[in-house]
Amino acid sequence: NQWMFRVGHTADHPLRIHPRLLHPDPMTGLFPVIAESTAVRMDLTHSGWSDIFFLGMDYPAGAQVLNISIDLCLNKNGETSEPRPPVEAYVRVIDQPLLRLCSVDLETTTDVRSIGEVFDFAKDYLGLLKAAVIASGIVPPGIESARQPLEDLLARLAGPGRGLEVVSKVNNIPKGSRLAVSTNLLGSLIAACMRATGQVNSLEGALTETERRIVASRAILGEWIGGSGGGWQDSGGVWPGIKLIEGVEATEDDPEHGISKGRLLPRHHIFNTDEIPPGSRKKLEESLVLVPGGMAQDVGPILEMVTEK
């Protein structure tokens, strides 16, 4: 991710929109859409805040979480819908030289026309989408103080007179669910933006392990840039299934060596069907009911307090 902090001018931006996304449909005039859907995560053991990345780096042996990726179905009046990924992200080129950000569930849209607006998280309710645009490298962190117009940056990415539309959608999950919805939505948005700019090998399908780790690291970056903070286990929905996420001691080959005891990113061990048989998975699935408490909470102050302690 180091290159994102070194780009200080729009002319130095290395990313380009994937060629397949630059040709509009001749009938509708609309450009192709990148669609990404992601699970949310359930933390069965509670990490005890050990997954805050710099705490895990100080004491990697104590950073362990049993984490499950889940799709959700709603139960209304005795009728249950089919399970589906609870968060979705979409990216496409538009024929206007601006950055259009839209949250379907919040019913909010804004047109961003300057680089400074991208970094203004207090201006509207779309800070998560702004964080994704920054952390994915579309508007890299190093360009925050650049004086060039956003239009120039978008022209370099997608061509003159063009811009990007980034859309998020959360499917019927109440606030305060404790399922790390915002972090996994951030990861989904980052993955979609990375696909659109050729930073992922394919425009659709599963991410590779290396790609997942990049998405997770950028989700951490996006959370802290946006001011909400967070830990690495919250992006567990990017990985499938039931997994053990644990801190790893830094070795001589790691950039963290000599700086901290542990690595920035943890190790993800996805349990196979020999370790957790299908019957056990089925029993676990059938024994869980999620009931929302209806209490939304800003965990930023709590994270700050835990970190200070």
Where are these regions (language model features)?
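DPxDG-like acidic metal-binding loop motif
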Residues: 177-201
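C-terminal nucleotide
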Residues: 1-155, 174, 197-205, 209-229, ...
